[in-house]
Amino acid sequence: MDRGYTMLGFVVIVILYAVIGLMAAAGTILIARKMLPPKAEQIFYAMFLIMIAAFYLAFTAYFGIAAAWRLETAVVVAFVAIGLLGARLPFALIVGYSLHGLWDLLHELQAHGAYSAFKPGQLTAIPLAYGVFCAAFDFCMAAYFYARRAEWIAARKAVPQ
């Protein structure tokens, strides 16, 4: 098949996954705001950061990239720490989701040979355009957290500790 068609197909897939990531973020925000009070919403997103970070360990196991375990595990541990901080500090969620979006893009760029900050095999493989989907979701969520931070801080202060 012609290289032009291959590139066109890839661009269409990337655009679709980015749009789906944005739609997933919008749906998540809509449902969480409707179902959870502000304090619980913040805690939900903090725990969700931990879960989405753990996907990379699942990918490492699935794709059998043994050399990636050390780095991927260390990064997941860092996201767990950020997530735990994010349960109380909105700024940690903003930073955590932004960093996770960058982590997703690094994986996507390495998967396509466009850029690699690490040696071959240090990062796990990911499904096609997963990094684009997840980065779109993560960056949208970080922007939402920035907009929501004052309300979360007020809710935390209103509840006796």
List the model feature ranges, each with a label:
Residues 36-39, 59-68, 87, 124:
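Membrane-interface helix caps and helix-loop-helix hairpins in membrane proteins
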Residues 2-10, 16, 20, 33, ...:
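Functional transmembrane or membrane-interface alpha-helices that line membrane-embedded catalytic
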Residues 48-62:
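A generic, lipid-embedded transmembrane alpha helix
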Residues 71-77, 95-98:
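Hydrophobic core segments of alpha-helical transmembrane domains in multi-pass membrane proteins
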Residues 97, 101, 105:
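Catalytic glutamate of the conserved HExxH
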Residues 22-29:
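Transmembrane alpha-helical segments of multi-pass membrane transport proteins and ion-pumping complexes
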